[in-house]
Structures are given as C-alpha cells and as structure tokens.
C-alpha cells in the first residue's frame, strides 16, 4: 500500500479509537457524578475554545514577528512565503523564538492567524534547503488543521490528569497530617480516585500520542509531496537536530509546542547518524510515550520515499 494512503487510514483508525475511548470514559465518569451530559459537553467546548484562543499568546512568549522587510531575517519570511505558495495555502505569520534548542512548530488559529515559530539555533545549523523542508513539514500541520485537532483530543486527558494530580497531592497531604480515622479515610479515598484517574489518563494519552505520531509522519509525507527528491533534506535536518540536542532532555507531554524528542548520538556527522538510524531496529515501544515517531522511523520513511529518485 502506498505510504500516504496507509498513513491516512491509520490516522482515521487512531482518531476513531481515541474519540471512542475518551467518549466511553467520559460518559462513565459523568454518569457516576450525576452530571448532565449536555452541560458537560458545553463545559468541554468552552474549555476548548478558551484554550484555542489563548494558546497562541502563551506559545509565542520570547518571540518576535518577522516580516519581508526585516533587514536580518526577511529571507526567512520569504522562504516561508515561497513554500506556502507551493503548498497552496496562505502564508502564515512567522515568528523567531528565543529558545536554546533548534525547533520549529506550527500554532495559531483563525482569529490570531496561523503562525510558524522558528528558533534561532535552527537557523544556525540548517542549510536553506534543509530549513525549507522543515517549513514544508510545519505547513503540513497548518493545512491539515493539526493544531485544532490536537487541542480537541488532548483536552479530556489533560483535564483528567489535572484532577488526578490534585487528588493524589491532597490525598497524600491529608494522610500525612491526619489527626483521626476520618482524615485517613478521606485521604485514602482521594488516593484511590486519583489513582484510577491517573490510570485512565495514561491509557487515553497512549491513544493521543499514537495519533500525534501519525500526524507527524503525515507532515513529513506532506513535505515530501512538496519537494519530492529534495525532501531528503528533511532527513538531514532531523539528523542535525538530533546531534544538537544530544544533551537536552525535553518532556514529551509539553502540549501544543511541537518538539522533537532527543536521542543519544555518538557521531557529529549527520550522514553517519543517518546511516546508523537506517540500520537501527525499532518496534512499537520505541516511541510509545513520544509525541513524535522515533527518529529512525522518520528517516526510514523519508529514505523509502526518496530512494527511487536520488539513490
């Protein structure tokens, strides 16, 4: 089966299972608490809308917008503009982000405008062609409305996880400072409920992360569709990012910010790292807790797509 078609089918399956699992657990909890279903749905929609509206402002802290007239970075805007034209979408607003690691991410909404954030280190380590392929990947997220979908399917696990953390924290505190049997009973009850919610959150998060990894692979495929054999530059970009980040640890649950999980590397040469990743064996557990596919899986997919053209 063609890679693009396979990715689409897998995304549909993953999204369906994610929605069904979240719906089942939500209905069980709502019925247990005797909350009206309509009220609960309205409450979730309001929370999603608030998050959708304010998230761009939270993400773009320590960033500055770049325009075509910028004397130092106008070329970055023009590069995004050219790739957007090739992708057939409106040019997003471009922001340079003051972060210590190389990264690029898509964010924004229809109110603030779709946006792309690019960190300074990424500009420093990539060639123009490599940066172009990364931008193609991010524009794929914008064209496919991945930001909105990601916020929607991640909302329920986030709420349950937040409540779970509160119950576990307060439960332990209640046990520690308990003065009678009633306090102990309350503390144990909180720990029990918090523990159950933690397990549910973890289970749901596995589905969300699975869908996120498929979205990332589809964004890689979108970059390939834009540049064909030149999409091999995306593999080189990924290798350079991995090398740069070999000593940086990032939380895979950072939410809206699209990050690239670091892996330990020995080589300083991207080509050597690519060769190692092409030989590396991976399985379903290699990236099960990551928002992005394992680097070896991404490199292998790009290699499979571009091999007939350049190798």
From Swiss-Prot:
CDD domains tied to this protein: M48B_HtpX_like
EC number, as in UniProt: 3.4.24.-
Cofactor stoichiometry and binding remark: Binds 1 zinc ion per subunit.
Coiled coil residues, start to end: none
Catalytic residues (UniProt): 138
Required cofactor names: Zn(2+)
Single GO biological process annotation from the record: proteolysis
Keywords: Cell membrane, Hydrolase, Membrane, Metal-binding, Metalloprotease, Protease, Transmembrane, Transmembrane helix, Zinc
Signal sequence segment: none
Annotated Zn(2+) binding sites: 137, 141, 216
Places the protein is found: Cell membrane
Transmembrane residue ranges: 12-32, 35-55, 159-179, 184-204
Membrane topology: Multi-pass membrane protein
Protein name (database record): Protease HtpX homolog 1
Name of the gene encoding the protein in the UniProt record: htpX1
């Amino acid at each position: 089966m063609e890679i693009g078609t396979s990715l689409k089918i897998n995304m549909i399956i993953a999204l369906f299972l994610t929605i069904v699992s979240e719906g089942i657990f939500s209905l069980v909890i709502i019925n247990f608490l005797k909350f009206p279903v309509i009220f609960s749905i309205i409450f979730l929609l309001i929370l999603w809308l608030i998050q959708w509206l304010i998230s761009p402002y939270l993400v773009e802290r320590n960033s500055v917008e770049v325009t075509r007239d910028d004397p130092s970075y106008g070329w970055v805007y023009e590069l995004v503009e050219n790739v957007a034209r090739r992708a057939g979408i409106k040019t997003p607003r471009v922001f340079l982000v003051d972060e210590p690691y190389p990264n690029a991410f898509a964010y924004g909404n229809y109110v603030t405008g779709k946006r792309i954030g690019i960190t300074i280190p990424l500009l420093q380590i990539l060639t123009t062609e490599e940066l172009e392929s990364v931008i193609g990947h991010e524009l794929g997220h914008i064209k496919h409305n991945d930001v909105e979908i990601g916020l929607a399917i991640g909302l329920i696990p986030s709420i349950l996880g937040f409540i779970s953390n509160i119950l576990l924290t307060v439960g332990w505190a209640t046990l520690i400072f308990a003065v009678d049997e009633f306090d102990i009973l309350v503390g144990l009850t909180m720990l029990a409920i918090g523990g159950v919610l933690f397990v549910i959150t973890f289970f749901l998060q596995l589905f969300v992360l699975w869908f996120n990894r498929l979205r990332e692979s589809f964004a890689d495929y979108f970059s390939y569709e834009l540049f064909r054999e030149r999409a091999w530059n995306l593999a080189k970009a990924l290798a350079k990012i991995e090398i740069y980040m070999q000593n940086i640890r990032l939380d895979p649950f950072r939410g809206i910010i699209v990050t690239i999980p670091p892996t330990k590397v020995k080589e300083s040469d991207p080509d050597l790292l690519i060769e190692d990743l092409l030989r590396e064996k991976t399985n379903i557990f290699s990236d099960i807790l990551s928002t992005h596919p394992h680097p070896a899986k991404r490199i292998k997919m790009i290699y499979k797509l571009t091999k007939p053209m350049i190798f």
